[in-house]
Amino acid sequence: MTRDSFLNDPVNSYLIYIPGKNTDVMIGVPHHAPLGVQHLPCESHPTSDENTGFIGYRLAQMLDCPCLIAGNYFIDPNKYKSSDYFKKIEAIGPRFLIEIHGHAGRSAHFDIEISAGSLDKSVLSENLANQLSSAFSVHPSLRNYTISGDFFQIHFRATKSLTINTDQWTAFHIELPQKLRENPDQYILLCESLEKIIRAL
């Protein structure tokens, strides 16, 4: 199967690893499903993050860095150190992990929420959020999205994610709204903005 065939597969569970030269950075996507597939075969994480695999892969292409995508997955892979997802990230050993997630808008306090997993690291997520907000301000299609990395203010704090809460690498958990995830023009601009920010880390 081709990469796009995997990412568009609405049924089969898979973990796909796409290598890249810049191993200082790694992109992770633990809950991908194609657009229109809202559910995962996972009791502890039944809601999918639609289309996040395509976004993560596009960002990894721009950065020429490794990308790891779990699609239609039967476990919640970023919550267990024993998962093949966690072990692959550990084997690569990046300095920075960028995890792409999606939300439906019902619980989020902001359109885009960024967490580094704990209050102690809030300064990192706030800095990334501020830079992304500044980048979005020059694009008419993006400037109205609200963005926060303030641990006190956001809903999706990623406190239970073991890929985020670790000292093995610096990690950012990025929650994206459905509207942005389903619009290629918008998510390509997002990826271009993130590429510039991440290269300067």
Where do the model's predicted regions map?
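N-terminal catalytic or cofactor-binding beta/alpha core of small enzyme domains
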Residues: 1-201
